[in-house]
Structure formats: structure tokens, C-alpha cells
Regions:
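N-terminal Rossmann-like dinucleotide-binding module
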Residues: 1-53
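NAD(P)-dinucleotide binding in Rossmann-like oxidoreductases
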Residues: 207-218, 222-237
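Predominantly a Rossmann-like dinucleotide-binding segment in NAD(P)-dependent oxidoreductases
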Residues: 130-210
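A short helix->loop->beta-strand "cap" motif at the edges of active sites that frequently abuts
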Residues: 55-56, 93-95, 120-123, 225-228
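Hydrophobic residues in well-ordered beta-strands that form the structural core
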Residues: 19, 59, 98-99, 124-126, ...
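Rossmann-fold dehydrogenase core element
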Residues: 112-129, 150-153
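Beta-loop-alpha module in the N-terminal Rossmann-like domain of NAD(P)-dependent dehydrogenases
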Residues: 44, 53-116
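Core-facing hydrophobic residues within beta-strands of well-ordered domains
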Residues: 7, 33-35, 55, 71, ...
Length: 237
């Protein structure tokens, strides 16, 4: 992109619900973006996207979409375990990347993705939408002003009803589980409001959450501060 008024042409890897219900509509409403292409391995999803959003290009191969020279940026709403692979491949094709949270499954994956982005001169961003809301900015402003005093303890709870037992959110091998899926929200927010992070300790406890054996709560202790988080997901009985 060589001019400030050029619109960003987006390609989307996968027709996940968050893509079709939130991000694609947002791109279409944006004054500086164009929904250019979608890739999915399921032809029926491509047909739906083409009919619903009048998508100019559809691909059954992620690689083929990445090779499209007209695409500037890639949005990745794939399962968590695939973020590293396709973020790095997108960077290698010279595409900027907006990747769904959590951006990686561990620090090593994140470092690889950051290194690839720097190597190929592209922007990599994790899709935490709340970081740019007026409410979040106001909360941070108040906390950092000292009006409430020093932060000594943070407790957060993030709960929702997951009615589909077959969801990838219940598959550990794909990076599913409440800790990855929603636990990253309170962790990310805490990192925004607590400037100094000198040491991190974590303990996960709790009984298995059906239908997969995953922990449902954890405590994270940071130097001079304690952050307690409960992450729970339940299916309908």
C-alpha cells in the first residue's frame, strides 16, 4: 500500500461464525477496507458467503488465497492450534495479519510468529476488539490516574453457555478449552492495566468440564499483585 487513501483488500481464511457474523460485516461497513476473498474447504460455505456477502473471490485452498497478489491483509479465525502455521505462511506471502485470539498456544509460538512478521515486513495483530473501545480506555484512564489507589488484587469471571458439545472449543488437540478461549481476555486486560510484570505464577484447579477434561479455574500471581480468574464453560443439560 503506497497511498494513505488506498483501501485494504482483505482475505479471510475460514468461514467461522465470528468471521461471518462479526468481522466480514465490519469490513463491509468500513470506509477503508474491501472484502476481497474467502477460503474454505467446504464448498457449501463458499456458496453461502458468495450469496450473502457478494464475495468477489472464493477459494477451497488457503494456500491459493495467500498467493492472490491483490490481497493486502489476512484475517485468521481458524482453530487456535492452526494460528501459528497460517500466520507464518501469510507473512511469507507478504500479507499483513489480523489473527483471532489467542494468537498462539504458548510463548514459543508467539515468538515465531512475531519473528516471521518482522522478517517479511508485515504487521501482525491479535484480535482483541475491546482494547479499542471507549469503555476500556476510560477504565484504564481511571486506574492509571490513581483515583482508586494502588491495584492489589484483580478478580475476573468470564462465563457463557456453550450449547454445542461438538464444538472445537472442547477439543484440546485444536487448542480448545475455556482457558484458551476466554481466559486470554482477563489475562490480556490485566496486562493492559498493570504496567509492571516481574514474575508470573499460575495454578489451575477444578473438576473436568464435560465433554472434555479441561481445567475450569486458575490463579495467577504477579509480583506485588494477584490476579484471580475463573473460566468456566458448560453445555446444556
Amino acid at each position: 500500500m503506497t497511498t494513505s487513501n488506498k483501501k485494504i483488500r482483505w482475505g479471510v481464511l475460514g468461514y467461522a461464525r465470528i468471521a461471518r457474523e462479526a468481522v466480514i460485516p465490519a469490513i463491509l461497513r468500513s470506509s477503508n477496507s474491501v472484502f476481497h476473498a474467502i477460503a474454505s474447504r467446504e464448498p457449501s460455505k463458499l456458496d453461502e458467503c458468495r450469496q450473502k456477502y457478494n464475495c468477489p473471490k472464493t477459494f477451497q485452498s488457503y494456500e491459493e488465497l495467500l498467493r492472490d497478489p491483490e490481497i493486502d491483509a489476512i484475517y485468521i479465525p481458524l482453530p487456535n492450534a492452526l494460528h501459528r502455521e497460517w500466520t507464518i505462511k501469510a507473512a511469507e506471502h507478504g500479507k499483513h495479519v489480523l489473527c483471532e485470539k489467542p494468537i498462539g498456544l504458548n510463548a514459543a509460538e508467539c515468538r515465531e510468529m512475531i519473528a516471521a512478521s518482522k522478517q517479511h515486513g508485515v504487521t501482525l495483530m491479535e484480535a482483541f476488539m475491546y482494547r479499542y473501545s471507549d469503555n476500556t480506555r476510560k477504565v484504564i484512564e481511571v486506574l492509571r490516574s490513581g483515583a482508586l489507589g494502588e491495584i492489589k488484587f484483580i478478580y475476573s469471571a468470564f462465563r457463557f453457555l456453550l450449547g454445542n458439545p461438538g464444538s472445537i472449543k472442547f477439543k484440546p488437540e485444536l487448542g480448545g478449552g475455556s482457558l484458551y478461549d476466554v481466559g486470554c481476555y482477563p489475562l490480556n486486560f490485566t496486562g493492559m492495566v498493570v504496567d509492571e510484570i516481574a514474575r508470573i505464577q499460575a495454578v489451575a484447579t477444578g473438576k473436568p468440564v464435560a465433554p472434555a477434561p479441561m481445567p475450569d479455574s486458575a490463579s495467577t500471581s504477579w509480583m506485588k499483585r494477584i490476579c484471580r480468574m475463573d473460566w468456566r464453560s458448560r453445555t446444556r443439560s
